Design a protein with these regions (language model features):
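Regulatory and interdomain segments flanking nucleotide-handling catalytic cores
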Residues: 1-197
Length: 197
């Protein structure tokens, strides 16, 4: 999914950041780099959704096949049907962009804890437990400390545009060590400041 997100960022006009967690990708697209900057597909929501979903499927299946070639039978049976994606597009004010990514990251954290609990307990054992209770149950009964999971497993990852001095140009990179956005809003805010120039 990270490679799919990176490919989308590299190929979608006006993309400024990608955020990925589990099977969900969020992209920030803008059209205000200059007065002459055009919006991707002139704001046609149907076109944006259909093309971005198609691109995600294309890139994901391409990257998945590469994994199948490298890892063999582990992935082979899962690759026969291929993956497909849906997409949504909506406008939000600049002032709400950071809050949007906070919301997505909070969802990632909740899903991470619940997914780890579901992998270790039956639905009956975890029914009606909140995330704090799930973490306690994992630690007390299985010796698993969710806080010891990798950052990318707990919070997701971002694909960001950085300047690479060695090639003297910008490139998209995957950041697997993103901060907790509620504790470090500057991570997103600094990307937005770069947009404002």
């Amino acid at each position: 999914m990270q490679q799919t997100t990176k490919s989308l960022c590299e190929n979608i006009q006006g993309c400024k950041i990608g955020y990925v967690e589990s099977d969900e990708i969020s992209l920030l697209l803008t059209d205000y780099d200059t007065l002459q900057t055009d919006a991707w597909f002139d704001y046609s929501v149907q076109k944006i959704c259909s093309v971005s979903a198609s691109m995600a499927a294309l890139f994901f299946n391409k990257h998945w096949q590469k994994n199948v070639a490298e890892l063999g039978d582990v992935y082979k049976s899962k690759s026969e049907l291929g993956a497909y994606f849906d997409a949504r597009a909506f406008n939000i004010p600049k002032e709400e962009i950071t809050n949007y990514f906070i919301w997505r990251q909070n969802d990632a954290t909740r899903n991470s804890i619940q997914g780890l609990a579901q992998a270790n307990f039956s639905q009956k054992q975890i029914h009606s437990l909140n995330n704090s209770q799930l973490q306690d149950k994992l630690h007390e009964e299985k010796g698993i400390n969710w806080n010891d999971c990798k950052t990318v497993e707990k919070r997701g990852s971002c694909v960001v545009h950085v300047f690479d001095k060695s090639i003297n140009r910008s490139k998209w990179v995957i950041d697997e060590e993103i901060p907790i956005f509620t504790q470090n809003r500057d991570y997103i805010e600094n990307i937005l400041k770069k947009l404002e120039g």
